[in-house]
Structures are given as structure tokens and as C-alpha cells.
Amino acid sequence: WIMGHMVNAIGQIDEFVNLGANSIETDVSFDDSANPQYTYHGVPCDCGRSCLKWENYNDFLKGLRSATTPGNSKYQSKLVLVVFDLKTGSLYDNQANEAGKKLAKNLLQHYWNNGNNGGRAYIVLSIPDLNHYPLIKGFTDTLTQEGHPELLDKVGFDFSGNDAIGDVANAYKKAGVTGHVWQSDGITNCLLRGLTRVREAVANRDSGKGYINKVYYWTVDKRASTRDALDAGVDGVMTNYPDVITDVMNEAAYKNKFRLATYEDNPWETFKK
């Protein structure tokens, strides 16, 4: 999965997919009442990027729905996965469950069209704080109560705080999550970060008894760091330059080992070599 980083304006969806992304990451900011409000990152952000592009969250969802609904004039068949980077740092810990409920209602109405031929992309809810694990239950309970438990087949989870792998496993246990887990690791492109924890996550994924199904690394903008990430065995790389990742994947060393994921590739299944 080539994951376009910080795609917060509707116009950027086409821009990143046309550069080779089959997945996008979108920031979600919340108001004081734990309502998802804007797709907005703010300052500071990655070097070389504008941090200030935004939409109202519900408007972005409608644009995303158009891009991921077959038959729509805006449909992009390659776009199969969306990571919502949930900026829950602005919330109190006791608002996490409420944020999950409200997120579920927004997605149900504006993205899934109340279960009636909505967008088809797989969704990863990425949470920065392990203490906010109740967001998951708020989300899953609400979709079930609203009569659409089948949509949970399309939803996975990520804790993005670079916490110790054991602590992340514990948070999932508390949240009652037993699958659909992506594990992120990374840092802004302005700084360097080694691959130690990525390798640990990959080992957990491949052990057959870990909690992780997929591992992605962010933010990867250079050919050398792309090669390092692929060599470490990641399933996805998040990038500001999807075309750079595409170029590396076409190199002799990688083109027979890796290919771009399609809609037929289940993002919740651990890939067996």
C-alpha cells in the first residue's frame, strides 16, 4: 500500500492517486464536544508541505465517497484504503468513547450512505493515544446499534504513538479488538528514525501469535529510505511522494517481490510468504 500523506482537501485525492497512491491518510480534528470537525493538520507538519489545507469533515467524506464509489464520475478504482489520523489530543480521555460514536455516525451517513451503495474503501482508524482505546468501542457499538454491523468488515485500527509493542497489545485487549490491526511506526520527514521498532512489529506480525496484521512506516520520501522499509518487510509506506515509491517498486530488486495492493487484497489478512 502506497499511502499518500496528509490528504486533507478533496482536490488532493485525485492528485495523490494520480501520482501512484492506492491509499490516503487524512487528518481529523475534533471540536470541544468530540465531534469530528475538519480534515486539518495545522502547523507544524512535514517539511516541504503546506500544513493548512482543510475541508469540513462531512464534506471531505462526501468527496471521498465519490472517489470510491464505482459508477461515480469521480471514481478512482485504485484507491482502496483510507487511514483517518484522529487528532484526539485535543480531547479529554473521558471523551474518547463519545468521539468514536460521533465518528461512526458521520461515516455511516456521509461515507457509507447509510449502507446504500456508499464508498467501498477500507478504513483504518488511527489513534495517537493508547488511553483513547474506548473510541474503538464507541465506534463499533454505534455501527451495530445503527443496524450496520456488516460495515465493521471494512474497518481496522492503528495506534500511532510509537508505544512499546506490548503496551499496544494490551490496549487492544482492553478494547476487545482481535483482528484488523495495522501497526504504524514513524516520524515526520524532517527527522530520521531507525527501523528497530518496525522490525519488532514485523516479527510480531509474522510470529503467527502476535496482534499485528499489517505494518506501515511513515513518512518515507526518499529512495534510500523506501528501500530500507521494503527490505524490513513492511506492508505499507506513507509518503508525500507516491511516485518515488512507485519508482523504487519498479527496480529490479523489488519488482518481483512487491506489487501494488488492489481491492481484492484483504488489508486485514496477514500476508503469508
Swiss-Prot record:
<dbReference type="GO" id="GO:0016829">
    <property type="term" value="F:lyase activity"/>
</dbReference>
<comment type="similarity">
    <text>Belongs to the arthropod phospholipase D family. Class II subfamily.</text>
</comment>
<feature type="binding site">
    <location>
        <position position="27"/>
    </location>
    <ligand>
        <name>Mg(2+)</name>
    </ligand>
</feature>
<feature type="disulfide bond">
    <location>
        <begin position="47"/>
        <end position="190"/>
    </location>
</feature>
<keyword id="KW-1061">Dermonecrotic toxin</keyword>
<dbReference type="GO" id="GO:0008081">
    <property type="term" value="F:phosphoric diester hydrolase activity"/>
</dbReference>
<keyword id="KW-0204">Cytolysis</keyword>
<protein>
    <recommendedName>
        <fullName>Dermonecrotic toxin LspaSicTox-alphaIA2iii</fullName>
        <ecNumber>4.6.1.-</ecNumber>
    </recommendedName>
</protein>
<dbReference type="InterPro" id="IPR017946">
    <property type="entry name" value="PLC-like_Pdiesterase_TIM-brl"/>
</dbReference>
<feature type="binding site">
    <location>
        <position position="85"/>
    </location>
    <ligand>
        <name>Mg(2+)</name>
    </ligand>
</feature>
<dbReference type="GO" id="GO:0016042">
    <property type="term" value="P:lipid catabolic process"/>
</dbReference>
<keyword id="KW-1015">Disulfide bond</keyword>
<keyword id="KW-0442">Lipid degradation</keyword>
<keyword id="KW-0354">Hemolysis</keyword>
<feature type="binding site">
    <location>
        <position position="25"/>
    </location>
    <ligand>
        <name>Mg(2+)</name>
    </ligand>
</feature>
<feature type="active site" description="Nucleophile">
    <location>
        <position position="41"/>
    </location>
</feature>
<keyword id="KW-0800">Toxin</keyword>
<dbReference type="Pfam" id="PF13653">
    <property type="entry name" value="GDPD_2"/>
</dbReference>
<keyword id="KW-0460">Magnesium</keyword>
<dbReference type="GO" id="GO:0046872">
    <property type="term" value="F:metal ion binding"/>
</dbReference>
<keyword id="KW-0964">Secreted</keyword>
<dbReference type="GO" id="GO:0005576">
    <property type="term" value="C:extracellular region"/>
</dbReference>
<dbReference type="GO" id="GO:0031640">
    <property type="term" value="P:killing of cells of another organism"/>
</dbReference>
<comment type="function">
    <text>Dermonecrotic toxins cleave the phosphodiester linkage between the phosphate and headgroup of certain phospholipids (sphingolipid and lysolipid substrates), forming an alcohol (often choline) and a cyclic phosphate. This toxin acts on sphingomyelin (SM). It may also act on ceramide phosphoethanolamine (CPE), lysophosphatidylcholine (LPC) and lysophosphatidylethanolamine (LPE), but not on lysophosphatidylserine (LPS), and lysophosphatidylglycerol (LPG). It acts by transphosphatidylation, releasing exclusively cyclic phosphate products as second products.</text>
</comment>
<feature type="active site">
    <location>
        <position position="5"/>
    </location>
</feature>
<keyword id="KW-0443">Lipid metabolism</keyword>
<dbReference type="GO" id="GO:0090729">
    <property type="term" value="F:toxin activity"/>
</dbReference>
<feature type="disulfide bond">
    <location>
        <begin position="45"/>
        <end position="51"/>
    </location>
</feature>
<keyword id="KW-0479">Metal-binding</keyword>
<keyword id="KW-0456">Lyase</keyword>
